[in-house]
C-alpha cells in the first residue's frame, strides 16, 4: 500500500478498496464511504497523533504484545450542523468504531493491518468492516467498525476464547488452536461451518506470517437471541514483516508446536 502513503489528492487511491479514485473524490469512493461509515461523504477525523495522549487518557496499552503497542481509541460519528460534515469524536466504550494510529516503535502498522485484512477478503475470509483513514494532517490510521455494537451503541453479546476457556487475559498466549476448535464445537450454534471458517483463518495467518492470533483474537457473538456464531476475522497483522527476528510462526500451539509448522500439522490437528 505504498501508493497510499502520500498527501491526499483528488486522483489517488481509495483508502477502503485501494482502487483509483474518480475526479472529485477525496480519499474514498462514495459507495466505499457508505459501506464503512454509513454515509457517502466520509466523516472528518479532526485530530493529529500528538493530541491523543491528552484526548484519551483511558487508552489501553500493553508492554508485552505487538498489537498492544498501538493505541486503540473508541470513536463514534457526531452529526454535523446544517451544511457541516459529520466528524469522529473520541468517546467511551460505547463507540461504534475503533481507531489505531501510527506508532513510533513499529512504523506503518495501520497500513500493514489493513493490507492483511484486505488480503483475507481476497481469499474470501469474512472480516470485520475496516479501512484506512487520515488524521487532519494526512497521516494514515487504521479504523474498524465494531461488530458487537448496534447502531444505537448498545452491545451485542460477544465472548472471546479467553473468556470461553475461563482464562485471564494475561494467559491469552497459553493454549492451542485445537482447544479453540473444541470451544467452537461446544458453544457455537453452527459448529461445522464455524470450524471451517476458523481453520481458514488459522491457515491464512500462518501463510501471511501472523504470529499474534491468540485466544482473544477469536470470538463468538450473538446477533439473535441464544444463537452464537464465530465472528468475522479481526486484528489480522503480518507480524513477520514487523518483527522478522521472531522465530515463532503462530501465537498458539498447533500439534504441540509454534514453529516449523508443516502441512501435516494442520491435518493432524
Walk through the language-model features, giving the residues of each.
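Catalytic-core segments of enzymes that bind and process phosphorylated/nucleotide-bearing substrates
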Residues: 160, 164-179, 183, 223-269
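Short hydrophobic/aromatic-rich motifs at helix boundaries and adjacent loops
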Residues: 43-46, 87-91, 153-154, 238-242
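Conserved ATP-binding subdomain of kinase catalytic cores across diverse folds
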Residues: 51-172
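Short, mixed-charge, low-aromatic patches
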Residues: 28-34, 67-76, 135-141, 154-161, ...
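Conserved kinase catalytic-core segment
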Residues: 104-122, 176-242
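Regulatory N- and C-terminal appendages and interdomain linkers associated
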Residues: 1-53, 186, 227-230, 269
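N-terminal short leaders/motifs
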Residues: 18-28, 78-85, 215-217
Amino acid at each position: 500500500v505504498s501508493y497510499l502513503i502520500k498527501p491526499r489528492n483528488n486522483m489517488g487511491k481509495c483508502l477502503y478498496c485501494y482502487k483509483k479514485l474518480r475526479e472529485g473524490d477525496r480519499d474514498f469512493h462514495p459507495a466505499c464511504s457508505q459501506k464503512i461509515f454509513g454515509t457517502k461523504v466520509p466523516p472528518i477525523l479532526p485530530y493529529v497523533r500528538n493530541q491523543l495522549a491528552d484526548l484519551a487518557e483511558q487508552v489501553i496499552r500493553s508492554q508485552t504484545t505487538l498489537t498492544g503497542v498501538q493505541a486503540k481509541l473508541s470513536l463514534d460519528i457526531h452529526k454535523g450542523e446544517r451544511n457541516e460534515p459529520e466528524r469522529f469524536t473520541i468517546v467511551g466504550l460505547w463507540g461504534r468504531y475503533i481507531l489505531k494510529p501510527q506508532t513510533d516503535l513499529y512504523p506503518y502498522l495501520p497500513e500493514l493491518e489493513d493490507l492483511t485484512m484486505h488480503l483475507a477478503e481476497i481469499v474470501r475470509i469474512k472480516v470485520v468492516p475496516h479501512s484506512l483513514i487520515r488524521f487532519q494532517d494526512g497521516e494514515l490510521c487504521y479504523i474498524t467498525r465494531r461488530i458487537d455494537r448496534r447502531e444505537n451503541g448498545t452491545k451485542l453479546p460477544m465472548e472471546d476464547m479467553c473468556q470461553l476457556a475461563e482464562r485471564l487475559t494475561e494467559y491469552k498466549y497459553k493454549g492451542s488452536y485445537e482447544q479453540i476448535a473444541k470451544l467452537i464445537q461446544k458453544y457455537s450454534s453452527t459448529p461445522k461451518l464455524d470450524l471451517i471458517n476458523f481453520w481458514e483463518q488459522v491457515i491464512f495467518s500462518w501463510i501471511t506470517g501472523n504470529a499474534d492470533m491468540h485466544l482473544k483474537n477469536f470470538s463468538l457473538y450473538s446477533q439473535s437471541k441464544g444463537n452464537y456464531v464465530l465472528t468475522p476475522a479481526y486484528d489480522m497483522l503480518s507480524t513477520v514483516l514487523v518483527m522478522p527476528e521472531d522465530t515463532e510462526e503462530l501465537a498458539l500451539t498447533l500439534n504441540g508446536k509454534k514453529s516449523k509448522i508443516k502441512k501435516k500439522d494442520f491435518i493432524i490437528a
